[in-house]
Amino acid sequence: MELTIEEMLIKQKETGAHYTPTDLGDIIAKRLINELKKSGISGTKKIRGLDPSCGDGELLLSLNRMGKFNNIDNIELIGIDEDKEAIKEADFRLNEMGINDAKLSGGDFLDMVDLEGNLSLFDDDLSKIEPVDLIIANPPYVRTQVLGADRAQKLAKLFNLKGRVDLYHAFLVAMTLQLKPGGLIGVITSNKYLANTTGESIRQFLAENYDIIEIMDLGDTKLFSGAVLQAIFFGTKKLNKGIRQTAPANFYKIYEETDPSKTEVSIKFETLFGLLESSNTGVFNVDEKFYSVSCGKLIVPDSFKEPWVMATDEEYNWITNINNNSYCTIQDLCDLKVGIKTTADKVFIKSTWEELPDEIKPEVEVLKLLISTDHASKWRPLERIGNQKILYTHENLNGKKKAIHFTQYPHALAYLETHRETLEGRKYVIKAKRNWYQIWLPQNPDHWALPKILFPDISPEPKFFYEDEGCCIDGNCYWIIPKEENNNDILFLILGISNTKYMTNYHDIAFNNKLYPGRTRYLTQYVSNYPLPNPEANYSQEIIDVLRELLFQNPNDERKIEIENQIENLTALAFGVERL
């Protein structure tokens, strides 16, 4: 029975199945075959190649095709997938190409792996199968919230996973167990582990278990129908986990380019897949879309907490120069916080409170102005906040944040009672032993009155802006306040530097986290590590002075452009780098 488009999308979300394009499969297979030839084992005994989530067999076909092209015809193909219909399709396609000896099995690969080391892929006479020589895979990517807490916890315990568990984490561990020491792997993953805090355990696992050959960050090329940005990991399983890799790993990084000054000097390239196979760097025009490509050596810091940096020698020297000339990072002088998350915005956030009947119109004392990513703009918010307000359920008593007893605000309580069923439906609130009417993630109300810097969590360009009107902050924004009270100067310095081309360039190189389409994720884990010059230095003081003029003296457009250019120049001087 054919699935409707809606049913297919639901299945993709639940299973994480996004089949690999043929050309991309060929690129991965060709790279693995080339590494096989380098290893010297390609012409000896039979080579077992496994795809543990083979779907309709695309990657197995690529592996066979690239092997034959390189005169390697001793690869035994092994495919597993829990989708029985996909296995039938894979069997048909392989047989159609004259491949009659492939071993295909319907089942969950994660259930087939013996974690004690006696690995068996099938329940028949192949139960004694040895680990494989080669793995080519596009394992399912299913986020924790879709996977479900129970299965996520089970997988975490079973495969000794830490942090937020996605399904491909478990596949990485299971595939590594199934791979021979010295065996090769080419696997498509999310690229999030390269730079995210949540990727620490994956970075550690890969670095400890593999000599990394190359990582290809596919960026926002949209080669798959899913929204997840992909990377391809190539590695050789270590013979000894205790030996640290000494040979440098390579990287290839491709992202859509939107800067007109760069696209006007682009080089025409016929196909995106052809571009992926090349080692060319620069800006390329493929079907009227522009892509920036860089290649170089992967930087793997000693600490797995730090992101893996994919930078050319020139880029690496540039950020190293900035780091060496910095005084501290933002987190050394300031606290960074996430905005409010109510988990029931339709109940708590409105611009129409005044239109409610008097008996359920909340008292003004509990209605607070709200600012969100909709107001985000460089320097100052786009508008003077507007009428959107939040019914705030917390107050500060004796220096502690506490839920309000709404008996003192009868109209607000009456309003909340009209939505009691909805609010009590948030079982996690009740499970956390909180009052049914509370917003999920509040902040200390005393902090709202403080001057602060805000920035949206996702934006195509930096939009750090100053707020001093005592607003509450929505959960789609982050905010910065000084650790030392009344130290507004440090806010002006941070505001100036964070909005420059220099910090945008630093962010792109050091944290490498572009989203679709050309948008950047401004998480606190990144922004907190922005470098700062000495706040007392002359260049810093000049930045602070011109920021005051920009914020409080309402300069005309011409003067505003002059100030922004001044800030760019002063930032370059403060960090000892050339003007971008």
Curated annotation (Swiss-Prot):
Q: Which GO terms describe its molecular function?
A: DNA binding; site-specific DNA-methyltransferase (adenine-specific) activity
Q: What class of enzyme is it?
A: transferase
State the InterPro entries in the record: DNA_methylase_N6_adenine_CS, MethylTrfase_TaqI-like_dom, N4_N6_ade-DNA_methylase, SAM-dependent_MTases_sf, TaqI_C
**What SUPFAM superfamilies does the entry give?**
S-adenosyl-L-methionine-dependent methyltransferases
Cite the EC number.
2.1.1.72
Which superkingdom heads the taxonomic lineage of this protein's source?
Bacteria
One of its GO biological process terms is: DNA restriction-modification system
Q: Which UniProt keywords apply?
A: DNA-binding, Methyltransferase, Restriction system, S-adenosyl-L-methionine, Transferase
Which reaction does this enzyme catalyse, per its entry?
A: a 2'-deoxyadenosine in DNA + S-adenosyl-L-methionine = an N(6)-methyl-2'-deoxyadenosine in DNA + S-adenosyl-L-homocysteine + H(+)
Family statement:
Belongs to the N(4)/N(6)-methyltransferase family.
PANTHER family membership: DNA METHYLTRANSFERASE A (PTHR33841:SF1), DNA METHYLTRANSFERASE YEEA-RELATED (PTHR33841)
- Remarks, miscellaneous: The protein sequnce was determined following expression in E.coli.
- Its name, as the record gives it, is Type II methyltransferase M.BanIII
Which source organism? Aneurinibacillus aneurinilyticus (Bacillus aneurinolyticus)
